């Protein structure tokens, strides 16, 4: 059992982790930027460490500052929440070198599945159906434009390290592609510290239904059922509905197998 956990996040997810720590009699340490000193998560935690200025790249995304804070307070584990450093394999390896447990997947799994472009490639190699699009990462707008022209518009430009609707843009024609790509890339760099992109065929009026799998390091694995996340704003989920009204019992039985 951990004695002290540093929470490398902010907002609602940090508050939830703090509550879980309290229920388990584990000391919680919040980190905050200079702009978040009075935020709820900073007030609720047993300890709070300010790790830098307001921009995320200088605070929540600064791996050395986050890890330095954990070492300074004597935390034996770091919980990343979601977003920020939660799918950064380099950060996981840094934690391992400092003998601090990263609460989440191993660096090897994140390398394969944490990066969405790499995850697409892994699934394609395994024969799993995916939305038509690129198999490899796209680094330059001109390269992506040629791919999109061949694929046909509209296309969705996505950040490989993306999440929470960040770094996603729909492009409807070749003339707008370079500007749209660069806008999405800049947003991804600011949000995740990674401007690598990939491209998919844009699907209009889709249903977004997820099946979440949870496993521990001992090999115990469960699924948590389906969640319909189709109601979104700016590509970010607003409501998660379970069970989904859009999938039949027959389809569910096939997927659960």
Regions found by a protein language model. Name each.
Residues 1-254:
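N-terminal beta-alpha lobe that positions the nucleotide/phosphoryl donor
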């Amino acid at each position: 059992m951990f004695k002290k956990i540093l929470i490398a996040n902010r907002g609602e997810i940090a508050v939830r982790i703090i509550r879980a720590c309290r229920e388990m009699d584990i000391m919680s340490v919040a980190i905050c930027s200079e702009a978040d000193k009075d935020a709820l998560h900073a007030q609720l935690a047993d300890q709070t460490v300010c790790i830098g200025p307001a921009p995320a790249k200088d605070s929540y995304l600064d791996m050395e500052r986050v890890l330095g804070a954990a070492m300074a307070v004597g935390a034996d584990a770091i919980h990343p929440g979601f977003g920020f450093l939660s799918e950064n394999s380099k950060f996981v390896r840094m934690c391992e070198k400092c003998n601090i447990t990263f609460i989440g997947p191993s660096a090897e799994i994140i390398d394969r599945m944490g990066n969405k472009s790499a995850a697409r490639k892994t699934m394609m190699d395994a024969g799993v159906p995916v939305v038509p699009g690129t198999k490899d990462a796209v680094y330059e707008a001109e390269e992506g434009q040629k791919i999109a022209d061949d694929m046909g518009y509209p296309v969705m430009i996505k950040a490989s390290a993306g999440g929470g609707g960040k770094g996603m843009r729909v492009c409807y024609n070749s003339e707008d592609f370079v500007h749209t790509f660069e806008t999405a890339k800049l947003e991804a760099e600011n949000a995740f510290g990674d401007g690598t992109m990939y491209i998919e065929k844009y699907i209009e009026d889709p249903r977004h239904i997820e099946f979440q799998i949870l496993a521990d390091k001992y090999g115990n694995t469960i699924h948590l059922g389906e969640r319909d996340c189709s109601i979104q704003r700016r590509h970010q989920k607003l409501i998660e509905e379970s069970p989904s009204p859009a999938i039949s019992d027959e389809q569910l039985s096939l997927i659960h197998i």
